[in-house]
UniProtKB/Swiss-Prot annotation:
One of its GO terms (molecular function) is leucyl-tRNA--protein transferase activity. The gene is aat. GO terms for cellular component: cytoplasm. It is an enzyme of class 2 (transferase). Keywords: Acyltransferase, Cytoplasm, Transferase. It catalyses: N-terminal L-lysyl-[protein] + L-leucyl-tRNA(Leu) = N-terminal L-leucyl-L-lysyl-[protein] + tRNA(Leu) + H(+); N-terminal L-arginyl-[protein] + L-leucyl-tRNA(Leu) = N-terminal L-leucyl-L-arginyl-[protein] + tRNA(Leu) + H(+); L-phenylalanyl-tRNA(Phe) + an N-terminal L-alpha-aminoacyl-[protein] = an N-terminal L-phenylalanyl-L-alpha-aminoacyl-[protein] + tRNA(Phe). This is Leucyl/phenylalanyl-tRNA--protein transferase.
């Protein structure tokens, strides 16, 4: 039976109670205030819903993650990064990045990054928890991604690209920086060929929960202003 969250209670049901079909649906309802979002990520779940649906919370099993030391970069992409005209920054245009991620996609109808969702993550950015990666070409924002940094973990949310390989360049730059900062794991949530091409792989939900317990409260050397 699916748990419906109460507004005055920030707790989530145990991860092992998530539904098998659809895979990982843990709870419904609640809200997107910062306290609940932070509680969700600490617990091992994340919000995802389409416009017109109730707010849904997910913890899939298995969970797709990328260990920074396992990053794979193709020779063609590495060449583009060396000789291309892209410039990558952090936290310079968070609102614009999340708007880009919410834009229309050729392969999907609608967006799960609704206006309330955008507003919620902008608030987390203002709190110093959510961060963006921007990819620029001739002064124009052509790609980027955003997510949350908590302890030694980064929770990736979405990315977009308006130029060839722009989001890939941003993602690789982020992973290499996270590796320098000593991050242990990047949460990719669900498997895609795109992420798997970089070395992302699936681990049991229980192993993901163990990683949360081990790394969430460890201080990192991250400097997003650099």
């Amino acid at each position: 039976m699916l748990t419906w969250l109460k507004r005055d209670d920030l707790s989530f049901p145990p991860l092992e109670t998530a539904l098998r079909e659809p895979n990982g649906l843990l709870a419904a309802g609640g809200d997107l205030r910062p306290e609940r979002l932070l509680a969700a990520y600490r617990h091992g779940c994340f919000p995802w819903y389409q416009e017109g649906q109730p707010l849904l919370w997910w913890s899939p099993d298995p969970r797709t993650v990328l260990f920074p030391d396992e990053l794979h970069v193709s020779r063609s992409l590495r060449k583009r990064m060396r000789h291309g005209d892209y410039r990558v920054t952090f936290d310079k245009a968070f609102a614009e990045v999340i708007q880009g991620c919410a834009g229309p996609r050729s392969y999907a109808d609608g967006t799960w990054i609704t206006t309330p969702m955008q507003d919620a993550y902008v608030r987390l950015h203002e709190m110093g928890v959510a961060h963006s990666v921007e990819v620029w070409q001739q002064g124009q924002l052509v790609g980027g991604l955003y997510g949350l940094a908590m302890g030694e973990l980064f929770f990736g949310e979405s990315m977009f690209s308006r130029a060839t390989d722009a989001s890939k360049v941003g993602f690789v730059t982020l992973v290499e920086r996270l590796r320098e900062w000593g991050f242990a794991l990047i949460d990719c949530q669900m498997p895609t060929r795109h992420l798997e091409s970089f070395g992302a792989r699936s681990i049991p939900r229980a192993a993901f929960a163990e990683a949360l317990a081990m790394h969430l409260d460890r201080p990192s050397a991250a400097d997003w202003r650099a």
